[in-house]
Amino acid sequence: MAKRYLLDFEKPLVELEKQIEQIKELARDSEVDVSQQLLQLETLAARRREEIFKSLTPAQKIQVARHPQRPSTLDFVQMFCDDWIELHGDRNGGDDMALIGGIGSINNRPVLMLGHQKGRDTKENVVRNFGMAKPGGYRKALRLMQHANRFSLPILTFIDTPGAYAGLKAEEHGQGEAIARNLREMFGLKVPIVATVIGEGGSGGALGIGVADRLLMFEHSVYTVASPEACASILWRDAAKAPEAASALKITGKDLLKLGIIDEVLPEPSGGNNWAPLDAGNTLKEAIEKHLNALLKMPEDELIEERYKKFRVLGKFIEANNIEEIYSEIPQKTE
């Protein structure tokens, strides 16, 4: 098993993890029965981990969402089905590896699964562009969704990106147009769409595959109009204000559920999905099946109409005389 990567706020667990590893090595190298000591230490570590994760700040949740060992789109696909066939290419000369898709089945029901894909190490992240899709990636996604629409396949999307790639070439090749076209076309698809934020849900890069009948989020995932670092740099000219920006942006599942932006917050195992990926997979699979079963009973016209209404009610119109009230809610920079 790969060595666990602990986040900075998990430091109280470091010593316990070392002791657990030492006892496991002792058990492997000798015939000494250490099962009781191991059980006690693992129980203590689990209790402390649960205490830590019960009170995470939005900024800490971002760290969990970006955890390098957090289950990715491909991890969930492999948990859900063993007959998945990846489909490649945008039919315009490109095959973006940051956004993948293919056909598989869940409980003998054929579905299209597509999502952002990050790497596990530097080499993989270079290939996957750190999960930041280029215009070709969104065009590939649209091609696959149109294929699913043609063959009446429900669509499952997995969102995990800091945002769409913002390089010069991406802009020259129509990044904004590619995402906007996806938004427009997804509103008209006649098949159920269930989207899940499995890690980071960043800006337009997330929205490009996020127009769905049901939008789910894991407990420690985040969904935001801009990264807190970018927001802090814009508002306060100071990236160090990212924790304050994270709180102001309302990026957590709890906040977004209250605002009516998402439909369900999925619980995570103690310590986050990276501690028990299979448990996370079971939770997600059950939720997807529940929502798909409900959506498949709806007539096509009603499905499209409800999807349209879902997004039309988002946001709030505020009269000009209330602008000061809005600004008063934004944390101000202190000297």
Swiss-Prot record:
Subcellular location: Cytoplasm
UniProt keyword annotation of Nucleotide-binding present: yes
Enzyme Commission no: 2.1.3.15
InterPro entries assigned to the protein according to its UniProt record, in alphabetical order: Acetyl_CoA_COase_a_su, ClpP/crotonase-like_dom_sf, COA_CT_C
Keyword annotations: ATP-binding, Cytoplasm, Fatty acid biosynthesis, Fatty acid metabolism, Lipid biosynthesis, Lipid metabolism, Nucleotide-binding, Transferase
Spans through the membrane: none
Entry keyword Thylakoid: no
SUPFAM superfamilies for the chain: ClpP/crotonase
This protein's GO CC annotations: acetyl-CoA carboxylase complex
Coiled coil start-end: none
Signal peptide: none
PANTHER family: ACETYL-COENZYME A CARBOXYLASE CARBOXYL TRANSFERASE SUBUNIT ALPHA (PTHR42853), ACETYL-COENZYME A CARBOXYLASE CARBOXYL TRANSFERASE SUBUNIT ALPHA, CHLOROPLASTIC (PTHR42853:SF3)
HAMAP family: AcetylCoA_CT_alpha
NCBIfam families given in the database record: accA, AccA_sub, PRK05724.1
Protein name: Acetyl-coenzyme A carboxylase carboxyl transferase subunit alpha
Gene encoding the protein: accA
